[in-house]
Amino acid sequence: MKYVKLILRLLLGAFMVYAGTSHLTFNRQEFVAQVPTYLQFSPTFTDFVVLASGVVEIAFGLGIIFLVKNWRAIAGALLALFYVAIFPGNINQYVNHIDAFGLNTDNLRLIRLFFQPVLIFLALWTTGGWKYWKLWAKGKFFAEQSGKAERKE
């Protein structure tokens, strides 16, 4: 199971680096079209949202590949939160029938929506991010971190 987790984590990290790079280059306009209308204050801001999310995706991808255990787990938990945060863009694509990334039917766009929980699960499971996800859910993450700092002093 250890090697399955490792391989899936490396694949997820590579996927994130690829996706982030595509935000910055060859799929940029398709990502611009996917930005929900409530974030489209201006064309410049919409483009900024796409570019910023691309940089964040690259950082997460590299983080879950190269960071050491505890930092990797934090990166995985943050990546799961990122997947939750960008989910409205996927819903926007479905609701407004936006063709992008080969998703040119409502059925394909709907199927994509069901893959978001899979990505959230993979981010948490392959990195060990469950621990931090649970602490955040209970509102205890910062208390745990400050307790570690106090014990080290």
What are these regions, as identified by a protein language model?
Residues 1-153:
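Membrane-interface extramembranous regions
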